[in-house]
Structure formats: structure tokens, C-alpha cells
Regions:
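Extracytoplasmic gate region of multi-pass secondary transporters
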Residues: 27-28, 218-268
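Helix-to-loop junctions at the C-terminal end of transmembrane segments
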Residues: 60-73, 270-283
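C-terminal ends and interior cores of transmembrane alpha-helices
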Residues: 82-100, 293-305
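Cytoplasmic helix-loop-helix junction between adjacent transmembrane helices
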Residues: 109-146
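Helix-loop-helix hairpin linking two adjacent transmembrane segments in secondary transporters
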Residues: 139-195
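Symmetry-related core transmembrane helices of the 12-TM Major Facilitator Superfamily/SLC fold
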Residues: 173-191, 371-390
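C-terminal transmembrane helical hairpin of 12-TM major facilitator-type secondary transporters
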Residues: 282-329
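A late C-terminal transmembrane helix in Major Facilitator Superfamily
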Residues: 334-368
């Protein structure tokens, strides 16, 4: 790696550090209560704002990648940073708006935040892989680490940024403003600091997703892998956005925000341990083992109802649910479906975004215990899909080798 790109790499990673706050802040019980009080809605209704992030990502997925290839990583990252600033500052303004359209403003801003996520993904994942070209796996793992570190620190940062409005409502606007302004600063830095000039010509000639779908034959196994992108995302997103509400209402825990730290610790440790385990255990085994662990954990948490179990559950779901399972699923797709790996991987990510929107929208209309049951059902479906793929694994490997 050229040392002149070290500051650039740090700037790119810091985008995901703040993203770690932005993508999980609406799942914090204290944030939900503050926003709900300001907007005159139920706390669980705030989950629909989180769902809008998934909708925005879903909207941007078809064109964010091609635009990144055409305009370059710098412009794609700048669009992502600017859009994220709109989302975060928009949340602060929406809080101030109260019942005068605050909820609607936040929903629109969250869609913009989801679009930002897509542009950050297409710009930064490629850019850091081009900077740390000798170890692209380590480069992308760094993104997950920066997200997890931010999420681990979030409960403590919330306590430091709390304020009280004239109306007597608890406000976390300072945090929204700080993160939004930080994204504006990062946008400027991204435009100033050097980035490697990757050859985009070949990428520009790649077949688009729509054209690829027209003549791609999908086997039942490839459909199962796409659906796993939906189920595994649902497992950790429902936990991330709704588990603290379950802890407050069903366990009686007054302030469960520390669960976020345990969740993030599980994710961080999983990134390292899973990377080591995949050297000895086939990747495909994890798309069964990890959902089984999540399923058992969710059942125990639902039936046990204790603070200790909530903390243990947060750590385990962070490990087995959010610690790279989606990335493992895409890796398995690349190996098992060599001729359509780009198409299948894209559809796995679309399924993931679709889950963010549909499942969280549904959760916003439920009670926390009902959300936990829905998560159990969704995870159980993921277990069945993982079992099917593992049973068919040997046959699929033979087919993949024949295609090569």
C-alpha cells in the first residue's frame, strides 16, 4: 500500500464510523422515546423510520454501482457523505418540528440516508480494496470494525449529548448535528485527499443487472441463497431496532441501552474469530450454524425475560447474526454459482435491503413481544434454507466445478 493513501483510507473508514451511529441510533430505546414524545406517536412507530433507510437503499441499489463505476469512487463517496449529512441534520430538524410534520420529515430524510448508504458502499468498498490491494479482505473487514466500534460507543455518547428542550422533552439533537457536520467535513476531505485511479473502463462495459436477469437460469439452490440474504438480515435488524423495546416493556429494564455495546462487542469478536474459523470450516456451514445459534438465543430470550439474558442475547446475536453472516452468504454465492455470481450477489443484497424495509415496517405496527416472535419465525425459515443448501452442497460444488 502506498503510504500517501493512508490519510485517505482513514477518511473513508471514518465515513463508516459515523454510519455506525446513523444506522443504529433509531434502534436505541431512549432515542425512540424522545422522538415519539416530540412527534406524538408510539415508540415502536419510530421503527418505520428505520425501515425507510432500507427503502432508500433499495431505491439506490440499481444505479449507485453503475454511477460509481462511471463517475469514480471519489464522487460516489462524496454523494454518500453529503446525503448522510442531510439525513442526520434532517433528523434534528424533524425533532424540532414536533407534531408539525416532524415524523414525515424524518421519514423522507431516512430515505435519503438509505440512498447515502448505497453510495458509500459502492464508493468506499472498492476504494479501500484498491488502496489496500494486497489484502482486500482486511480492507473490507476494517469497514465492519469501524461500524462496530461506533455502535459500541453509542450508549456512552448518548449520555454525553442529552439536552432538554423548552417544552421539557429530552433531545439528542446535538449528536445528530455533530454527526451531520462531521459528514460535511469528510465530504470536503474526500474531495481533497488523493485516491487511487482504478481503471473503470472494464467495469463500465459490464452487463447491467436487468440485462443479466433476462437470460439467467435460477436453480432452486440459488433462490435459497437469495432468500438467506433476506432472513439473515431480518434476524439482526429486528434485534438491533426492537430488542431494547422488548427489554423495557417485557423485561422491565428501565435503561437497556448498554445492550448496544454487548451487541457490537459480539460483532467485533466474530469478525476475527469467524475469519479464522473459515480456514478450517467451510463457509457454507456457517449459513446453517449461525442461524441455529440465533434461533436458540431468541427463544431463550423470549421465554427467560431477564436482564442477564438480554445482555447475553445481544452479544450472541451481534456475533452470530451481524458478525459477517451476510458477507459469508455472498461468498458462498460466488463459489457455488460462478457463471451468475454477480447477478446472484446483487440479488442477495437487494433481498437484504427489501428485508430492511418490509420487516421493519411490519415491526413498527407490532408490540415488542410480537416482533420477537416474528424474528423467531424468520430465523427458523433461515435455518431451513441453510439446511437445504448444506444438504445440496456437494451436488452444487460438482456443478460449479463442471461450469468452470
Amino acid at each position: 500500500m502506498n503510504k500517501k493513501y493512508l490519510p485517505s483510507a482513514l477518511i473513508l473508514y471514518l465515513n463508516y464510523f459515523i454510519h455506525g451511529v446513523g444506522c443504529s441510533i433509531l434502534g436505541q430505546a431512549v432515542i425512540k422515546e424522545a422522538l415519539a414524545a416530540s412527534w406524538g406517536v408510539e415508540a415502536m412507530a419510530i421503527t418505520a423510520i428505520s425501515a425507510a433507510l432500507g427503502l432508500g437503499r433499495l431505491i439506490a441499489l440499481p444505479f449507485a454501482g453503475p454511477l460509481s463505476d462511471k463517475l469514480g469512487r471519489r464522487i460516489s463517496t462524496a454523494i454518500g457523505s453529503g446525503s448522510y449529512a442531510i439525513y442526520l441534520i434532517g433528523l434534528a430538524l424533524a425533532f424540532n418540528a414536533g407534531t408539525n410534520g416532524g415524523y414525515q420529515i424524518a421519514y423522507v430524510c431516512a430515505i435519503v440516508g438509505g440512498i447515502a448508504n448505497s453510495f458509500l458502499d459502492t464508493g468506499i468498498y472498492q476504494a479501500v480494496s484498491e488502496i489496500i490491494y494486497k489484502a482486500p479482505g482486511v480492507a473490507t473487514m476494517g469497514i465492519k470494525f469501524f461500524i462496530a466500534i461506533a455502535q459500541m460507543m453509542l450508549p456512552f455518547v448518548l449520555g454525553a449529548t442529552v439536552a432538554t428542550t423548552v417544552a421539557g422533552l429530552t433531545s439528542y439533537n446535538m449528536l445528530f448535528y455533530i454527526c451531520g457536520i462531521a459528514y460535511i467535513v469528510l465530504l470536503v476531505l474526500v474531495m481533497i485527499f488523493p485516491l487511487p485511479d482504478a481503471d473503470q473502463k472494464a467495469a463500465g462495459k459490464k452487463e447491467g443487472l436487468i440485462d443479466s436477469l433476462k437470460h439467467t437460469h435460477f436453480s432452486i439452490e440459488s433462490v435459497a441463497m437469495i432468500l438467506i440474504g433476506f432472513t439473515c438480515t431480518g434476524t439482526f435488524q429486528l434485534w438491533l431496532n426492537c430488542a431494547q423495546n422488548f427489554a423495557k416493556e417485557n423485561v422491565g429494564w428501565a435503561n437497556p441501552s448498554i445492550m448496544q455495546t454487548y451487541y457490537s462487542a459480539g460483532t467485533m469478536i466474530a469478525l476475527v474469530v469467524t475469519a479464522l474459523l473459515t480456514r478450517k470450516i467451510k463457509d457454507v456451514r456457517f449459513i446453517l450454524i449461525y442461524p441455529v445459534i440465533c434461533l436458540v438465543t431468541l427463544i431463550v430470550v423470549l421465554t427467560g425475560k431477564s436482564e442477564a439474558l438480554m445482555l447475553a442475547g445481544a452479544f450472541i446475536i451481534g456475533w452470530a447474526g451481524a458478525g459477517g453472516l451476510l458477507q459469508i452468504a455472498t461468498s458462498v454465492c460466488n463459489m457455488l454459482f460462478p457463471k451468475i455470481k454477480g447477478t446472484v450477489t446483487a440479488l442477495v443484497m437487494i433481498a437484504s435491503s427489501l428485508c430492511n424495509y418490509t420487516i421493519l415496517t411490519a415491526a413498527s405496527k407490532m408490540q415488542p413481544a410480537q416482533v420477537m416472535v416474528m424474528n423467531i419465525v424468520l430465523t427458523a425459515i433461515g435455518v431451513l434454507l441453510g439446511l437445504f443448501v448444506n444438504i445440496r452442497y456437494a451436488k452444487m460444488v460438482e456443478q460449479a466445478e463442471a461450469e468452470n
